[in-house]
Swiss-Prot record:
One GO MF term attached to the UniProt entry: purine-nucleoside phosphorylase activity
One GO cellular component term noted in the UniProt record for this chain: cytosol
Free-text function comment from the UniProt entry: Catalyzes the phosphorolysis of diverse nucleosides, yielding D-ribose 1-phosphate and the respective free bases. Can use uridine, adenosine, guanosine, cytidine, thymidine, inosine and xanthosine as substrates. Also catalyzes the reverse reactions.
Top-level taxon: Bacteria
Organism: Geobacter sp. (strain M21)
Claim: Amino-acid biosynthesis is one of the keywords in the record: no
Family the entry assigns: Belongs to the nucleoside phosphorylase PpnP family.
Reactions it catalyzes: a purine D-ribonucleoside + phosphate = a purine nucleobase + alpha-D-ribose 1-phosphate; adenosine + phosphate = alpha-D-ribose 1-phosphate + adenine; cytidine + phosphate = cytosine + alpha-D-ribose 1-phosphate; guanosine + phosphate = alpha-D-ribose 1-phosphate + guanine
Alphabetic keyword roster: Glycosyltransferase, Transferase
Protein name: Pyrimidine/purine nucleoside phosphorylase
E.C. number(s) listed in UniProt: 2.4.2.1, 2.4.2.2
Catalytic EC class: transferase
């Protein structure tokens, strides 16, 4: 799906890591939400409150997921899941466009 229809968008941006990671929140009619964002090259650690599905639309990164010491290479067209109340690290090597779905 290349677009979302009949949604609300929160005007205020979510800005993290001195502006190197930004996103906008999209709210669907059923109350579910996603964020659409961009990550610039760099290393970042994120903490989750709820489980997340991270879909990488374009770009490249390595990800260290909870319970795994080894990084996994992720590129545009791929996705990964993170459990609730967890922490994960990303090393973004090319500007990355992403969708984060809260599960």
């Amino acid at each position: 799906m290349s677009e979302f229809n009949n949604v609300s968008v929160v005007k205020e941006a979510n800005i993290y890591f001195d502006g190197k990671v930004t996103s906008r929140t999209v709210i669907f009619p059923d109350g579910s939400r996603k964020t659409l964002g961009v990550m610039l090259p760099g290393e970042y650690t994120f903490n989750t409150g709820s489980a997340e599905l991270m879909e990488i639309l374009s770009g490249e990164m390595t990800v260290v997921l909870p319970g795994s010491p080894d990084p996994v290479a992720i590129k545009g067209g791929e996705a990964f899941e993170v459990p609730e109340n967890a922490s994960f690290k990303v090393n973004v090597t090319a500007v990355s466009d992403y969708i984060c779905s809260f599960l």
